[in-house]
């Protein structure tokens, strides 16, 4: 029986290579001769054979690990298992213990550890492991020799060297064998043995796949448990931190309390441990437990599905091969039967042929040949069927082998995958319990230290200190401390109330918010016991343990000496206080609005906003302001603002107490803009203010602001809170992205955007012009034609003016809101390097919300989609040039300004610095520039290069444009120098005589005029015209006493209603040096510089009634000029007008001329040669007296100005009937001819002829 087993073992291990297999086979063969020997027990031989087989397997596993490119750890594990098996054999079979065997094992261990696995690759693998392979062969050869000698009896038992194998054996000193128990002794299998065991099972793949699926479900449950547990712990830590902070604040202000420092330390330990636990939870949720395990589970699921699909494919192939084999076998049997039938038929035919004779022989021969042919065909078919059957058998065998190999590979892959998953699970489990152990150990240590400290406290110690402090004899020191403490503690107030009142601040106070929040600390330094105990007496509820509902244990002012407290106010009705009772009460003190008013709600978690209320129990059902559910039970009500909510909603309440009745819910999102704007004094919705303010406080540098979406649930909650609480909502608890979403949602849901539907086409046309200018800039950016760059600047200025004109047509509330939003977005763009949001990105986001067409039912077309880019481009332009477009303050909605009433905000401008003076010159030169055609020279382009910059410092931000210098030339610069030098002489030498401006009419207050029936001309905005009216530095020297009754507020800066209020304008005419101007004009004529045509449309108030003014000029000389009610224009050269605005030492004043009302035809020109006498056209034309117009001792100025009027071309073209339907009595009363409105004059070809004239300097009148 033993011999039979040995033969079977020899056949099974015949594939093993090397000397080891040969030696083992020889030794096993030697067992035959020793089987009959009585000294060898059969059980002992069987055990010896099993040990030898196990040692052989270990050697083969080590070789396979080296050949299969395994990791260093795997090879070391295989070596460790080999040495462990060898050691067990030597301990069990002492006859095999030999020095040679131990030396061979030691050599193998040294060779394996000497290999540098980082340098191993496919090329040098054989060279690096050559010595390892030789060591393995040496160990196998030595073991085989010893075993052969022992079994063959060549060496006696006594001759064998029996060395005890101790733990200090050098062969095993570096391998941790003792700590690893034998896997075979425990019943465990090696990886290959696991695969071999599963291979014997027909359903091995299904079993392994089911185990992998079960592992995934198991891991999913573990991860779910850990995540839920961590979330609960995280929520608990947050609540613990809130509770500890509140308690620490409350006990911090109370002096001489027993174990106060101990409990403070305990609270600090709770806060610190909570923070550490939060960090631990975050780490476990990230890369310490949840994420690695989920990643491994997902990988397991993915590979399991792939393996399952592969196994199905292999099974299908095997099934197809077996079906083909069955079909081939049936076909072969069928062909064999057919062949047998043909053969038997052939045999009968031959017998008939032999028995036949005569004439039948021929027929029988034919039949015989036929049947022989059939027999041959049947035989051929049989052979073909047999060949097909053999092929199918071969195919089935190949498929079966492939299936076995695939099965083996799949089992190995699944085993590796399961081992990896187990390794990951082990690692993350170790992390989980290790981190929890560290957390618990630190908490245990801190609790032990607190316990030891509490044992050292002496009862009554703090009370003794309190008595000593109160009976102190140093009264002056105490009084000083009292005053010092009161002054220092008074501004601090109560933290929650002060920290929440900053919510509704405007952006200008945003810099103080963080300082205010930081100053609301509850820790009070100095002798605070004076405040807590000296003033006031013990209350009944606190000293005698009165009502537990009247005061809260969490209150800041629970101390008996809280002198800020007042007696609780009870409602007059006995059940609930009415709104009238609340309105008649005096404002609450800070102590009443703090957390000391919680009463019975001391155990309820409250938000910061909830702490500002003074709650009481609700006694009648109503609606909750937080969740909008019906409150029946567990409801609370604020005694001051009557806010009602569930007790559970106090933790998330965001509405602050306003100390007066809270208004009802408003319809904010999707409501008409005017309904919200009319409730604000400046017309800007409160939601726009508080959202922009909060974003500017803490999110200007947040990356992706206004682009990243927020939490939908929190956004809806904030929208609901804003409708319920309006400006009393504390939005600091919400994230910045949620606030941005609310702001965008409000703008998107407006029925009509800030830019009205009726102005949509004009703004889209403006956006197209902006696109055209941008394209020209891109094309000419790299060109060498620098002369065209000033023209680009002129185009930009023209677009700026047009945009200002269009924006002034918006209602005051729309304009102010758009101004506020654009300025806010400009601040966001200023931090584009941090938040990655430039003006283009914001234009794409806010474009469709700020300007959109009137909604229609028409289908969406490509052209309508293309308008989105125009909307975004317009908003981008407004943001980029916001400082130039919105150069004034906001417009109040209702401000009265009547003729003759002195406005408080209309005072003369202060003296300007040289830089501001240059800016104002450039700005004013732009007001009188032409919008139609402006030619510039090379000198102008050079000045433009020095002066144009759209990104200058903020001190020049009120200037209309930084490229206004392109409208001035060298003549202006020279005139500036001489005019300033002349002005300096006047200031040094003498004081100019005052110029008084008086009115012939009384300056009594008048009521507001009837609303206008005609639209104001929009060729230039009103604020541009009025900016030139008030006296400034240059004309202030020549105007001493100015009647401010003639000046009115600037609508852009002081908020004059453009539709309802009439305005009074004072025009100024300054003198100039005749000789200086002549030089300038000669130089200007040589350069053929600027030829500009301007038209200044005066305000509408002068179109309805005249204003008579009187100028007293340096003595008794005066001129009375009556301004007609008809509109008049003032065409003038922009360069000369700019020069005449500067004062001169020769002629400090210029003559004032009445306006000319007779308008020329649109095909004529305003050109007029020099005239020695300047006429004033009033009731009739007559020469003006030089003595009346010019001061004594001065010559006549041939370059005077004539003020004229030109109707608005838009009004003339749009409403011709209205213009011509005016009654003629007004003009007849003033003696003025009836003149039809003149249309806007296009540029004529004849103008070029006048520009080319060289005989004389052109003069426009």
UniProtKB/Swiss-Prot annotation:
Tissue: Widely expressed. Highly expressed in skeletal muscle and heart. Expressed at intermediate level in placenta, liver and pancreas. Weakly expressed in brain, lung and kidney.
Amino acid composition bias (Low complexity), ranges on this chain: 541-559
GO terms, biological process: negative regulation of small GTPase mediated signal transduction; regulation of small GTPase mediated signal transduction; Rho protein signal transduction
GO cellular component: cytoplasm; cytosol; protein-containing complex
Basic and acidic residues bias spans: 998-1010, 1133-1144
Keyword Cell membrane in annotation: no
Chain ranges of the F-BAR domain: 192-462
CDD domains: C1_GMIP-like, RhoGAP_PARG1
Pfam families: C1_1, GMIP-like_FCH, RHG29_45_N, RhoGAP
Matches recorded under InterPro entries: AH/BAR_dom_sf, C1-like_sf, F_BAR, GMIP/FCHO2-like_FCH, PE/DAG-bd, RHG29_45_N, Rho_GTPase_activation_prot, RhoGAP
Domain of life: Eukaryota
Phorbol-ester/DAG-type zinc finger span: 612-657
Residue numbers bearing the Phosphoserine modification: 171, 176, 179, 190, 499, 519, 552, 913, 949, 1019, 1144, 1146
Disulfide bonds: none
Region span, Interaction with PTPN13/PTPL1: 1258-1261
Residue intervals of the Rho-GAP domain: 671-886
Described function: GTPase activator for the Rho-type GTPases by converting them to an inactive GDP-bound state. Has strong activity toward RHOA, and weaker activity toward RAC1 and CDC42. May act as a specific effector of RAP2A to regulate Rho. In concert with RASIP1, suppresses RhoA signaling and dampens ROCK and MYH9 activities in endothelial cells and plays an essential role in blood vessel tubulogenesis.
Annotated protein name in UniProt: Rho GTPase-activating protein 29
Protein's organism: Homo sapiens
């Amino acid at each position: 029986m033993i011999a039979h087993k040995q033969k079977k073992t020899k056949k099974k291990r015949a594939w093993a290579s090397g000397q080891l297999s040969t030696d083992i086979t020889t030794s096993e063969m030697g067992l035959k001769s020793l089987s009959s020997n009585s000294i060898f027990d059969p059980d002992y031989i069987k055990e010896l054979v099993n040990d030898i087989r196990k040692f052989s397997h270990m050697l083969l596993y080590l070789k396979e690990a080296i050949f299969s490119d395994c990791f260093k750890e795997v090879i070391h594990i295989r070596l460790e298992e080999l040495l462990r098996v060898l050691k067990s054999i030597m301990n069990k079979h002492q006859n095999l213990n030999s020095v040679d065997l131990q030396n061979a094992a030691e050599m193998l261990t040294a060779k394996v550890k000497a290999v540098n696995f980082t340098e191993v690759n496919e090329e040098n693998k054989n060279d690096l492991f050559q010595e390892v392979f030789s060591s393995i062969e040496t160990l196998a050869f030595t073991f085989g020799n010893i075993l052969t000698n022992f079994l063959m009896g060549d060496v006696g038992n006594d001759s064998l060297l029996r060395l005890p194998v101790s733990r200090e054996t050098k062969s095993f000193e570096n391998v941790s064998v003792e700590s690893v128990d034998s896997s075979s002794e425990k019943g465990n299998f090696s990886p290959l043995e696991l695969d071999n065991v599963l291979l014997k099972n027909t359903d091995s793949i299904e079993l392994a796949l089911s185990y992998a699926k079960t592992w995934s479900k198991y891991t999913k449950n573990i991860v779910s448990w850990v995540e839920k547990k961590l979330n609960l712990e995280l929520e608990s830590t947050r609540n613990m931190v809130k509770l500890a902070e509140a308690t620490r604040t409350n006990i911090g202000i109370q002096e001489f309390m027993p174990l106060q420092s101990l409990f403070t330390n305990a609270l600090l330990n709770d806060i610190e441990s909570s923070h550490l636990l939060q960090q631990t939870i975050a780490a476990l949720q990230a890369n310490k437990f949840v994420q690695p395990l989920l990643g491994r589970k997902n990988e397991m699921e993915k590979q399991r599905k792939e393996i399952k699909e592969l196994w199905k494919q292999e099974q299908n192939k095997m099934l197809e091969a077996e079906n083909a084999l069955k079909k081939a076998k049936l076909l072969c049997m069928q062909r064999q039967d057919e062949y047998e039938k043909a053969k038997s038929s052939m045999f009968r035919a031959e017998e008939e042929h032999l028995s036949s004779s005569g004439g039948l022989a021929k027929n029988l021969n034919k039949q015989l040949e036929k049947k022989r042919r059939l027999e041959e065909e049947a035989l051929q078919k049989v052979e073909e069927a047999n060949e097909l059957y053999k092929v199918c058998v071969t195919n089935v065998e190949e498929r079966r082998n492939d299936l076995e190999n695939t099965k083996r590979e799949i089992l190995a892959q699944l085993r590796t995958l399961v081992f990896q998953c187990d390794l990951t699970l082990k690692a993350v489990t170790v992390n989980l319990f290790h981190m929890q152990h560290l957390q618990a150990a630190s908490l245990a240590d801190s609790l032990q230290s607190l316990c030891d400290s509490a044992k050292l406290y002496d009862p009554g110690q703090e009370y003794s200190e309190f008595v000593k402090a109160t009976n102190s004899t140093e009264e002056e020191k105490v009084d000083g401390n009292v005053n010092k403490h009161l002054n220092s503690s008074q501004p601090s107030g109560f933290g929650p109330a002060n920290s929440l009142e900053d919510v509704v601040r405007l952006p200008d106070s945003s810099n103080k918010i963080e300082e205010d929040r930081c100053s609301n600390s509850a820790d009070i330094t100095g002798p605070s016991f004076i405040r807590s105990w000296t003033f006031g007496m013990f209350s009944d509820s606190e000293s005698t343990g009165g009502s537990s509902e009247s005061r809260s244990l969490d209150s800041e002012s629970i101390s008996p000496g809280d002198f800020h407290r007042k007696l609780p106010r009870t409602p007059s009705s006995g059940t609930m206080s009415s709104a009238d009772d609340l309105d008649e009460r005096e404002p609450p003190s800070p102590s009443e609005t703090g957390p000391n008013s919680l009463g019975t709600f001391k155990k309820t978690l409250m938000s910061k906003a909830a702490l500002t209320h003074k709650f009481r129990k609700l006694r009648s059902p109503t609606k909750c302001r937080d969740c909008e559910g019906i409150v029946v039970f567990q409801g609370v009500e604020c005694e001051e603002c009557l806010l009602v909510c569930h007790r559970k909603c106090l933790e998330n309440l965001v509405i602050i107490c306003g100390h007066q009745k809270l208004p009802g819910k408003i319809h904010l999102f999707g409501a008409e803009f005017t309904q919200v704007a009319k409730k604000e004094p400046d017309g800007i919705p409160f939601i726009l203010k508080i959202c922009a303010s909060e974003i500017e406080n803490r999110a200007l540098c947040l990356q992706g602001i206004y682009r990243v979406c927020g939490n939908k649930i929190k956004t809806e909650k904030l929208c609901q809170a804003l409708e319920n609480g309006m400006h009393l909502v504390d939005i600091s608890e919400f994230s910045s992205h949620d606030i941005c979403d609310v702001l965008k949602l409000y703008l998107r849901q407006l029925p009509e955007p800030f830019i009205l539907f009726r102005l949509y086409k004009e703004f889209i046309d403006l956006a197209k012009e902006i696109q055209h200018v941008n394209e020209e800039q891109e094309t000419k950016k790299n060109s060498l034609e620098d002369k065209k760059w000033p023209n680009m600047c002129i185009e930009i200025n023209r677009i700026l003016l047009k945009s200002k004109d269009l924006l002034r047509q918006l209602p005051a509330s729309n304009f102010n809101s758009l101004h506020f939003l654009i300025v806010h977005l400009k601040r966001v763009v200023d931090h584009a390097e941090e938040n990655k949001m430039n003006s283009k990105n914001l234009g794409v986001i806010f474009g469709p919300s700020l300007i959109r067409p009137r909604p229609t039912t028409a289908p969406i077309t490509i052209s309508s989609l293309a308008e989105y880019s125009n909307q975004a481009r317009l908003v981008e332009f407004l943001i980029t040039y916001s400082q130039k477009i919105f150069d004034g303050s906001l417009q109040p909605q209702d401000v009265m300004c009547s003729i003759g009433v002195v406005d408080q905000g209309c005072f003369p401008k202060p003296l300007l610095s040289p830089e501001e003076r240059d800016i104002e010159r450039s700005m004013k030169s732009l007001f009188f520039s032409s919008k139609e055609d402006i030619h510039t020279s090379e000198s102008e382009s050079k000045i433009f290069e020095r002066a144009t910059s759209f990104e200058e410092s903020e001190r020049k931000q009120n200037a209309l444009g930084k490229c206004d210098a392109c409208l001035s030339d060298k003549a202006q610069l020279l005139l500036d120098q001489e005019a300033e030098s002349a002005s300096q002489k006047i200031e040094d030498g003498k004081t100019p005589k005052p110029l008084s401006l008086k009115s012939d009419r009384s300056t009594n207050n008048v009521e507001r005029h009837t609303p206008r029936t005609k639209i104001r001309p929009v060729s230039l905005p009103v604020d541009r015209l009025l900016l030139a009216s008030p006296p400034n530095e240059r004309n202030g020297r020549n105007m001493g006493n100015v009647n401010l009754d003639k000046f009115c507020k600037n609508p852009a800066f002081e908020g004059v209603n453009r539709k309802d209020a009439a305005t009074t304008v004072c025009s100024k005419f300054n003198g100039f040096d005749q000789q200086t101007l002549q030089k300038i004009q000669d130089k200007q004529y040589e350069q053929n510089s600027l030829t500009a045509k301007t038209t200044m449309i005066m305000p509408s108030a002068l179109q309805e009634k005249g204003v008579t003014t009187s100028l007293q000029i340096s003595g008794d000389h005066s001129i009375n000029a009556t301004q007609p009610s008809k509109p008049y224009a003032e065409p003038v050269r922009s360069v000369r007008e700019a020069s005449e605005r500067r004062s001169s030492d020769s002629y400090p004043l210029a003559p004032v001329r009445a306006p000319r009302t007779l308008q020329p035809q649109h095909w004529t020109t305003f050109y007029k040669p020099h005239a020695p006498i300047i006429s004033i056209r009033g009731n009739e034309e007559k020469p003006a007296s030089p003595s009346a117009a010019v001061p004594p001792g001065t010559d006549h100025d041939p370059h005077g100005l004539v003020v004229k009027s030109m109707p608005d071309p838009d009004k003339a073209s749009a409403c011709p009937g209205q213009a011509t339907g005016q009654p003629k009595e007004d003009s007849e009363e003033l003696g003025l001819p009836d003149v039809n409105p003149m249309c806007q004059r296009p540029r004529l070809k004849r103008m070029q002829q006048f520009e080319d004239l060289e005989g004389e300097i052109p003069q426009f009148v």
